[in-house]
UniProtKB/Swiss-Prot annotation:
Residues 146-159, 300-316 have a biased composition (Low complexity). It comes from Streptococcus agalactiae serotype V (strain ATCC BAA-611 / 2603 V/R). This is Translation initiation factor IF-2. One of its GO terms (molecular function) is GTP binding. The lineage of its organism: Bacteria, Bacillati, Bacillota, Bacilli, Lactobacillales. CDD domains: IF2_eIF5B (cd01887), IF2_mtIF2_II (cd03702), mtIF2_IVc (cd03692). Gene3D superfamilies: 1.10.10.2480, P-loop containing nucleotide triphosphate hydrolases (3.40.50.300), Translation factors (2.40.30.10), Translation initiation factor IF- 2, domain 3 (3.40.50.10050). Residues 483-486 are annotated as: G3. Belongs to the TRAFAC class translation factor GTPase superfamily. Classic translation factor GTPase family. IF-2 subfamily.
Amino acid sequence: MSKKRLHEIAKEIGKTSKEVVEQAQSLGLPVKSHASSVEENDATRIVESFSSSKTKAPTNSVQTNQGVKTESKTVETKQGLSDDKPSTQPVAKPKPQSRNFKAEREARAKAEAEKRQHNGDHRKNNRHNDTRSDDRRHQGQKRSNGNRNDNRQGQQNNRNKNDGRYADHKQKPQTRPQQPAGNRIDFKARAAALKAEQNAEYSRHSEQRFREEQEAKRQAAKEQELAKAAALKAQEEAQKAKEKLASKPVAKVKEIVNKVAATPSQTADSRRKKQTRSDKSRQFSNENEDGQKQTRNKKNWNNQNQVRNQRNSNWNHNKKNKKGKTNGAPKPVTERKFHELPKEFEYTEGMTVAEIAKRIKREPAEIVKKLFMMGVMATQNQSLDGDTIELLMVDYGIEAHAKVEVDEADIERFFADEDYLNPDNLTERPPVVTIMGHVDHGKTTLLDTLRNSRVATGEAGGITQHIGAYQIEEAGKKITFLDTPGHAAFTSMRARGASVTDITILIVAADDGVMPQTVEAINHSKAAGVPIIVAINKIDKPGANPERVISELAEHGVISTAWGGESEFVEISAKFGKNIQELLETVLLVAEMEELKADADVRAIGTVIEARLDKGKGAVATLLVQQGTLNVQDPIVVGNTFGRVRAMTNDLGRRVKVAGPSTPVSITGLNEAPMAGDHFAVYADEKAARAAGEERAKRALLKQRQNTQRVSLENLFDTLKAGEVKSVNVIIKADVQGSVEALAASLLKIDVEGVKVNVVHSAVGAINESDVTLAEASNAVIIGFNVRPTPQARQQADADDVEIRQHSIIYKVIEEVEEAMKGKLDPEYQEKILGEAIIRETFKVSKVGTIGGFMVINGKVTRDSSVRVIRDGVVIFDGKLASLKHYKDDVKEVGNAQEGGLMIENYNDLKEDDTIEAYIMEEIKRK
């Protein structure tokens, strides 16, 4: 069967949804709102109930309006302006009036006042009668019904009087023009009938609702009493269980307490009687004859009783303040749990008394007392030094020792700490082999033969310029090779290669013999303590003499096993691949004797082989993993920078996700390009890696400043003497960091009397506009090694007349600079003051420095000028400008009477009223 919603039924029969809902509820249907659904038969019942109620409505209206006579009234209409033709028209029944609650209250109050005046003494004697409220309620209802009928009769009489008023004053009320009666709907009559039905329904159901509410309250009170009884019973059972576990004396005391607590049930009753204040009589004042004051006093008294009862109920329900209830057994006092003192205590400098108390499970007041007895005045928030903490622990009998602070920024601790590796997880790892030797003795050719790739043909001039790391496989085992350059300029790179290597292959040409770089390679290998395998190359040449090579090496401490030494000698031809297999077998044999082990389960640590800046990838570093396993997305600290491993490629250029021990990989994701030879370590999370990297960068910067600004007695004379020496300023830019260091070291070693090389700046990457600007300011020559300038840098260099030299072979660079130094003339300079300025205000900017706001009082201040800071007539600092601004724009000069801002290189102690003197050194042309 289909269902109907109540609002649909209301729409069909022309009733409101509220009426339909109330009618359905009166019929016993389980509905809640107008959206509830009922069956068709129930819907029929609802409709029929309304039809039956319509038939009863007139009788109800008659009953509610007893004594009201309906008369047909004649109303005078103003048709035209004459009084001769009055027209009469029957008026509809009077509109039933809604209940006037205000009038009812006033009438009820007046009736009560009259009754109290008439029977005041009788009411005082019978004020304890319990049934007086019910009688008063019934009387009030009767009076309200009578008043309501009286009000309606009065309103009807008023209407009749008004009609008479119209007749007396001969005024005709305006009426609408009559319309034909026809089948017109009388909306007023219908509204009156609906209102009468609502009043009848309300009066019929009000008593029922009141009874339901009272029943619900009684049920809730009953449930609350049951819950209290159950809780009390559970509490008594728990108390009995505790009493059984307690000792006998305590049990006897508790029995007495329980007996005493169980008897005074009358105490609670007496408290209630006292709270109801039954012993005090209620006095009603009769000063006001209409009884309004008595009514107000009674009302206030009832309100006070309600507040008092509510307060009492809250008091009884408040578990924290149940002082009057003794029907339950008192809770036993919990004793403080005793904690044993620790045997050892690890402290840090500056711990507070409260922290120490928490660690040793004692009250801070107890420790403060002990310190006072020791002669130390302290509060619980006061920090203590290490000696005081140790004395305090001695008083407690605890062995105290200071906590060892671990420097998270120290990467070297991973290499020095033997506990970092787990001896049970050590496994065999591939050997790291470094090929060393003199230039053009065939190192890259040997690697080319090993890897079957033409590496040597790609090097400019046939010389290896930077370290390469490669890995090959022989007899199922991997061997990692490091190719170090053989030129003398790359001494530091060879030293780095020897520090990470396990075996050194010293390659010597059979026709050239031992050369200076060969001896240097021997010394590096011996300093690193690694075994040496000598590969005598170019034995296919006609002038080859291997015996001479063996004897020359013996003079430098490298003795063949055939002569009773420890070094293996293998005669090879790298060009034709002769005896290469024998060389690899010798490497594996020596590696097996060395017992090379690694722990692959720890976080990776290792060394940077090479680093460079790539235009598309950013900082790229070649790493050699020495311990642990390096994974993609690992947070890593490399040298003085940090980052996350974004991508890894092996020596063949293939992407890999994991790199184990002795594996060379090239990674991206670093913030800056590190230095070749820096150590790296993987941290637990990126936050720790960032903190360690920033701390290392800060320490490196501080160390650099200390080195550049430190003047000692040993170098004081050299510093003063350096002013007489001419210098050639150069800026070095190269493709990799190793080439930058090697080129700078080679240029500084050039020995020309009276002239020295000053490397103003050296970095990795292409030559940019900043390098040109620096070269212009410092009068330097830019040397690019395997890099080219950007188009913007070339245009700026042409405009500023800055010289840029590009090279791909290191020999050419050294020769060119040496010739320039030999032909260097000694120019003369004189100082020229450009202008003076006064510091008006200073601004300190974090991570930038101190900015001085100034006004030029004489001359001008240019961007490339040197400045002196003069305070009270004394020169405080002499240096170069770091920046010069006019408002927010970078400018080359600030003129007289103009304001601007400046920063001075390596100086942040500017103060107001300091004098800035700008000057330049002009070259005096020789005549």
